[in-house]
Amino acid sequence: MKAVYREMCPNCWGRISDERLVMRNPCEECLDEPVHADSYFQLVSAVRNALKLRGTLKEWEKIYQLENQTREIEEFFKKATGFTFWSAQRTWVKRLLKGRSFSIIAPTGMGKSTFGAFMAVWHALKGKKSYIVVPTTPLVIQTVRKIEGIMENANADVRLAYYHGNLRKKEKEEMLERIKNEDYDILVTSAQWLARNYEEVLKGRHFDFIFVDDVDAFLKASKNIDRSLYLLGFTDEIIQKAWEIIRLKKQMSRYLNGNSEDRNEKLNGLNREIEKLQREIEKFKRKNKIGIMIIASATGSARGDRIKLYRELLGFEVGSGRSALRNVVDSYLKPTKDIKEHVEELLTRLGKGGLIFVPVDQGLGYAEELANYLSEKGFKIELVSSKNKKALEKFENGEADYLIGSATYYGSLVRGIDLPHLIRYAVFTGVPKFRFSIDLERPTIYRALGLLSEIMDFLSEEDRRQAEKLHARLRRLIRNIPQFELLKIEEALAEGLPIENEFHNHVLGVFRELVEFLRRVLRDEEVLRKLAEDPFISLVKEEGKWYIEIPDVRTYIQATGRTSRLFAGGITKGLSVLIVDNEKVFNGLVRQMRWRFQEFKMVPFEELDLDEILRQIDEDREKVRLVMEGKISAKVKDLVRSALMIVESPNKARTIANFFGQPSKTRIGDLVAYEISVGDRMLTILASGGHMFDLVTNEGYHGVLIQNEGDMLKFIPVYDTLKRCRDCGHQFVDWEKKGVCPRCGSTNVRDALENVIAMREIAQEVDEILIATDPDTEGEKIAWDIRNVLAPYTPNIKRIEFHEVTRPAIMKAIQEARDVNENRVNAQIVRRIEDRWIGFELSQELQRVFESYNLSAGRVQTPVLGWIIERYKEFTESEVYFLGLTLENGLQVTIELGKDGKDVEPPEYVTVEEVQLEERELNPAPPYTTDAMLKDASTFLKLSAPETMRLAQDLFEAGLCVTPDTLVSLADGRIMEIKDAVEKSEGNLLSVNGLKPKEAKALKFWEIDWNGPLKVIKLKNGHEIKATPDHGLLVMREGKLGWVSAKNVREGDYVAFAYNTGHRGRDEYTLLKLMIKLGITDVMVELDEEYFNEKVAPIVRERISTSTKYKYLRRRVLPLYLLQEWGLDDYEAHVKSLYRQRAGSKPIPNFKLDGRFWYVFGLVLGDGTLRDSKVLISQTPLKDVKSVLEDVFPFLRVFETTNQVGFSNSIIAEVFRRLGARKGKLHPLVFGLREEYINAMIAGYFDTDGTFSILNDRKGPNFRGILTSKRGDVLRMLSVYLYQIGIMNYLRRDERTGVWDLIISNRSLEKFREKIYPYLRIRRAQFDEAYSVYRASRRAFEGDLLPVAPVFGKLKFKNGTKNRILKETGIDVWNWLKRPEGEIPRDKLSKVLEYAEESPEKEFLKSLVEAGVTWVKVKGVEEELYTGKLYDFTTTTENFLSNGAVSHNCTYHRTDSTHVSNTGIEVAKEYITQELGEKYFKPRPWGEEGAHEAIRPTRPIDTGRLMQLIRDGIIQLPRNLTRNHYRLYDMIFRRFMTSQMTPAKILYEKAVINAGVGKAELEGYVEIIEDGWTRLRSPPLRELPKLEKGMKLKVVEAKKWKAPKVSLYTQGDIIALMKERKIGRPSTYAKIVETLMRRGYVVETKGRKKLLPTEKGIKVYHYLVSKYRDLVSEERTRELEEIMDRIEEGIEDYIKVLGELYSEIQRYVSG
């Protein structure tokens, strides 16, 4: 049990544990023991029986009855139809059983008509009357047959009456008589019959169930709405009350958008009136028998006020069912011949089922011509026009295979056809377009509005403002006018006819004004010039007249939509082929399609996998046919599920629903549910309203029950629903008096319990629940609460999360549904409890001491308040005088005069004392994180943090990397810097798997630009890892093992370090092969005579024309680079000598480079000098070195000076140079050599730069093996290698001299003797002497220590084992536990484990003993700022070795990410390349890849375009955007776009101005040399005039003032500090500042928005710090944030943390 909820038991509405809820059981009061069962229904039944037996059955009976009755009805349905229910049909039944009316918007084949017919029979068998209304006579006949078939199959005796035009006269009379006498249980008629016969035949009748099939036909007579309401049982009086509510709500919307002073008063008055009327309607419904109504439609266009009567009286709104989903492959073809021939080819390749659309500019004449051409070629094709009314019918019955018609929005071929089983593809003979003469003859309203939008960017500022007003006015006026009425208005303008309707006359006036405006601006030559240059609009001149062509996007969407329809198995796939007849209009079409559909892509037709696409198209058509014939398989039925998606905010619910079309709406209590089809789901979307539960205040310790469980305390939070007073705004949890606000006494209180009841209501109806609360810990906790309280009502609940509210993101999230993350929930539980405990205790103390109930405190608030107070103190103490000078060149400088500057006189001239000018490259800033956005919004927009978060939320609803010098280990033994490994795409890495060494494949290489903080993790062995805060490391903490992000690693942790992995290098070289590897090919190779004459000479004669070939032939030599270039691969065995063509260069043989050679390399690495061709070694005794060199290079003369020994050979000198012997990097190939060669090299290094000695400490003589060098990079590589072969060591740097030491650990001395000692020559005796002294007093102790004492303490041993271990092994294990470090020798632990009993702890310890890693303690963690490249891999094992440590790859992430996904980069690419040019685009992923992404726009739409698209209705948002919304969007948009742009180059200037009385330093830029990202944002530097050293400038104006040197903080500054100091979280930054201001501890200055502490704030802070310093300190607060992160990562036990917090608080409370 993790928590207790009050009033959440599904049976008694009492308190219940989360455990019981998740088990789908009632509380312990209702049922002692939980009940288990295999299926959901079995569980519901078993619980009901158990409750009944116990006598506690209450509300559970309703759950049972709903499930049981649904099953009974489904059994009856199976008997009556032979089919089982679709998931959606099961949902509809449950709604009916609950007595709810609703609208069904479902695709073809979902069984709407069958369902209506079946439910009418079911109602009839219950003695109830039903009425089915269908659109046409054929459908009346079809429905009657359907009902008769159901009656026959079910053996049901039901009276059926119907009326249609095909009845004979006598039948009509008899049927009419039956209807008048109510001699029926079921009545079926057309909608038209209802309209004509209601008054005479049906008036005063009552139906229990009305099913309307096809809303469009029903609403042609809008009075049918009133008629249906009367038939359901409503009266004139009640319908009038509903009309009054509609009127009042319209009035409310006017006040909501207004700014009148008495606005709130008027709104409250309207609310009271509406609520009174609603209560009267509900009272009527309860007292009277009101029927149920279902309106069903695949599509619909319900408009106007009358349809709203259903909302007010029946609680639902009719949606259009119009789907915004497309499954179309959009392709284009650029014509290379006559378009007719292209169309013929396409029809031949694609087959039957094609629609051919001809653009309006080509005309109907061309369509006829094309139809005739194709008919002559043998295609069965029909032209769809007003003359050929049978064309569609012929296509449907198979007489025609293709249809051709005009590409116009209201054309029959574009809108009037819905045949998903027949239509497969669409071909466009040109781009669908609008074509206007600039004189605008016979304009239409929508085309005029479209044209106005397109040209708005080209108008003057004044004209643009007028255009925006006209556009907004006309769009607002026509919003609810049906299309046929708009046609009358358009005709009236064209013909000059009058209009009787006064409102329509007003619309006509605005339309006329708009047309005249367009005609005027289109005669402006400047506007025409700009239009001609635009890449998205076509301007053409024909017969002396100008025409504008713009894309007709609506027609393209509608026309291609014919090929892709929603049906009961998803969305059929379609294909569109567009022949491009106008490049500009085509570009415009693609751009506008991308604005509407982010996932839209237009692909060249020739690149399509046509066979695969056609296979998928035909597969879908077969499914549709099966569905239509009722033969669909159960498998497909299972694909279409009814689902409930729960989001937090109503805006988000509305936005998501609108992504998929126009949803139907249902009101459940105060909540609105949106229903829409998304192909494989009938989705109901509901908003929870955010947090619904909080800790109670009147139980346990501030809402937490504390129980003793053995040695531990258990903490159980008690939750109740949140309440909010609508009158005073007070939010609370506990009732003092039920239903009454404890603050103001109002009964107008909203309880979140109502939300829970509404959600439970819908949860019972669906097959699955998808909880889509926000993707953070708070959202996870809300999801957990929702999961818990809904679990008893449904069998399937999943969590989904999306990080941007876009259609693709939502569909992806649904596919990737998961369970609730318990670790994230645990972290949020702890965060809330800690906040409550600290807050309540400190707040009560403050209220007592200061005698004020408006005081509060929190752990995070307090240090933040302290920062503001401290800055205010600095501010008040730092006042000095300043002198502001304006110079003759316009430059303004400020001189600080100090505290005594009052009487200083300004100078007449100033002198430019220093000037530094240089070209600099400026990289853009990364995209916004939450804190950076809040800071900039505060600084530049003067917005408060809470306001910014609210604006951002409205907008949102509508690096795992290391530094370049990090060493990575490759699978072949090589060690190199990660930068080189990434750049060279080194694919095989060394990693660990199950703590054993394993080869890993690099799947992806990352190079990321970074400008931000890095964590520097310093290890006890001298290594350090510099990484982004979210980079993961394998860490051991208190015996627990796990991945920890760098920001959460702390001092005292142990990091996994590769150890004893063995060396995998196998490489051996000859001198020649090594030279080739190192790229040394400017060397002459002498070959033996036979090989040269046979293989080489013929090629020399053929390929070399210069005289040098004779030299080559005579001497039998050839440059090495030619041998390589010519591909001769068998020459090495025939090499006689190698030499360089320079004076004094002697030939040397090619020889094998064995251990002796690499030992010499080690000598040179340590103490060598490379001077041209000379190799010199400074080492004593020189004789020893000389003998080594003579041994290795017998063909060279070795010479000796007073302090050096060496030889001269340019080849070997160059080899040593390229290997990195004296400078540069040590070549990675060194560590790919055989182990004995590397060990010989290290021995050589020790023999020069090493020393072996004895250091006496308090324990006696101590052995010291040290290698000393200034080359820390080389020692780091050697250190990593030595660890891998089992030799522990540590690095140390003398900060004074910069010299590094590599010190061999005495715990690896024997391993050093085994591996390195055999190759020592010069210092062997020194080693022997020190070793013998050391071993004389110290016994050998080999191996590493494991920090596992906490785990070891949990092992179980049989009695007496301790003594047995001591006797048999000499190990006293119990002493290990006494060590503060808790470290245990690996070799001894291995022996002791043999005596332990089997347990998980034993297995864990065994895995550590056998592991290829050791554990190195973290000495400290620091942070540093870094600008530059970072690198990473994605690997098959999800880890790699960085600086020896085990590093995670590409998974860790947080909401404060700068990462940009590929989708985000594509958004930037599209905008930048189209608007600015391809040269400005430079993609950057920035931070790490993970769950979250940086704050960015979801579409390539800038602020101006966004305003236009919203104005045009193309983008529909759930709320109106304000000026501040647009300002914030613009800031986010520009920051993101610039983050993906090329660097800018500036002329940077830094100068010192001497004014005599003081100096001023200036820094800025003189000019932008290359603009780059500065096209969109200004550089973050001041613009300066160009200055020259010594220049004297006259002062033209001087001003003196006194002001503080230190600036007060803004809200943005505080948020940046919180981020920097790790106080708070992105989601709480704004709330913390808001709380401080709300409590009156801090105020904000009006103009500059600076934060000032109040007297109250200062007093409260000083009191808290004086009494509770450690409790509210910055350090403790930061530590707790890290603990929360560890809980979230599953490393820390949340109950243990709560115990520690409780103890901490109790110490202060009791004190």
Swiss-Prot record:
Binding site for ATP: 89, 106-113
Superkingdom field: Archaea
Description of post-translational modifications: This protein undergoes a protein self splicing that involves a post-translational excision of the intervening region (intein) followed by peptide ligation.
Major localization class: cytoplasm
GO molecular function: ATP binding; ATP hydrolysis activity; DNA binding; DNA topoisomerase type II (double strand cut, ATP-hydrolyzing) activity; endonuclease activity; reverse gyrase activity; zinc ion binding
Top EC category: isomerase
Span of domain Helicase ATP-binding: 93-256
ZnF RG C-terminal-type: positions: 722-751
Residues the record lists as binding Zn(2+) 2: 725, 728, 741, 744
PROSITE patterns: HELICASE_ATP_BIND_1, INTEIN_C_TER, INTEIN_ENDONUCLEASE, INTEIN_N_TER, TOPO_IA_2, TOPRIM, ZF_RG_C, ZF_RG_N
Disruption outcome: Grows up until 90 degrees Celsius; does not grow during 49 hours at 93 degrees Celsius. Temperature sensitive growth at 85 but not 93 degrees Celsius. Loss of ATP-dependent DNA-relaxing activity, no longer positively supercoils negatively supercoiled plasmid DNA in the presence of ATP.
Domain Topo IA-type catalytic: 821-1709
Entry cofactors: Zn(2+); Mg(2+)
Pfam families with a match to the protein in the record: DEAD, Intein_splicing, LAGLIDADG_3, Topoisom_bac, Toprim, zf_Rg
Cofactor info, note text: Binds 2 zinc ions per subunit.
Residue spans, zinc finger RG N-terminal-type: 1-39
Catalysed reactions listed for this entry: ATP + H2O = ADP + phosphate + H(+)
Span(s) of short sequence motif DEAD box: 213-216
Region (Topoisomerase I): 638-1711
More info: This enzyme is the only unique feature of hyperthermophilic bacteria/archaea known and seems to be essential for adaptation to life at high temperatures. It may play a role in stabilization of DNA at high temperatures.
Assembly and oligomerization: Monomer.
Identification of the protein by name: Reverse gyrase
Lineage: Archaea, Methanobacteriati, Methanobacteriota, Thermococci, Thermococcales
